């Protein structure tokens, strides 16, 4: 929207309101330095009900949403019912293609960070690797070795590579996904366990 000169009213996830506020603060600072008109970016904060109201609002000609396929179907249907347009990024299983000539060190760093950065909870997290068969074993070995070095803990501690999942629902969804992989005959290259903490 901004690149095309349009204003944008946006709502972040209700699970991460402080991240949305921080992003808006950065936008405010940059737009002020660039002498852009105020009001190009407006944040609103709330839950699912607010998102539903936005999808029903005829003053919003184009609605963009990122999230689950279930959410996207609901948003797309509501926006279409008022003849609005929608852009939906849904339930992605983002793939990274690793070619025969790939730089192995760079590839492993990108693949692992893409998967564990923000504990794999962003819409662009690496979920699948499509690896050229000639380097498959080397890539798998290097990734297993990299995962063995991941330090999990408080995201406020810069020595850690990965923080916790955002809430119990996220933990349960993750565990269910692992069960589904096992049930479908998937092979685990590295076995871990759910961590427990004091708080």
Question: Which functions belong to the PLM regions below?
Answer:
Residues 29-30, 70-199:
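ALDH superfamily catalytic-core signature
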Residues 1-106:
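Rossmann-like NAD(P) dinucleotide-binding subdomain of oxidoreductase/dehydrogenase enzymes
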């Amino acid at each position: 929207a901004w690149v095309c000169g349009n204003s944008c009213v946006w709502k972040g996830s209700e699970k991460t309101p402080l991240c949305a506020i921080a992003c808006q603060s950065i936008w405010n600072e940059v737009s002020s330095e660039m002498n852009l008109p105020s009001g190009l970016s407006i944040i609103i904060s709330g839950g699912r009900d607010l998102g539903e109201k936005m999808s029903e609002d005829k003053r919003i000609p184009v609605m963009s949403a990122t999230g689950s396929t279930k959410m996207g179907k609901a948003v797309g249907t509501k926006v279409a019912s008022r003849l609005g347009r929608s852009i939906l990024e849904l339930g992605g299983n983002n793939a990274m293609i690793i070619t025969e000539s790939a730089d192995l060190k760079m590839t492993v760093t990108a693949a692992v960070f893409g998967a564990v950065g923000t504990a794999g909870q962003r819409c662009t997290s690496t979920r699948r690797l499509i690896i050229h068969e000639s380097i498959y074993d080397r890539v798998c070995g290097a990734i297993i070795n990299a995962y063995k070095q991941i330090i999990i803990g408080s995201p406020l501690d810069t020595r850690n590579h990965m923080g916790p999942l955002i809430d119990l629902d996220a933990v349960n969804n993750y565990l269910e996904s692992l069960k589904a992989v096992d049930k479908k005959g998937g092979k685990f290259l590295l076995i871990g366990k759910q961590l427990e903490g004091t708080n």
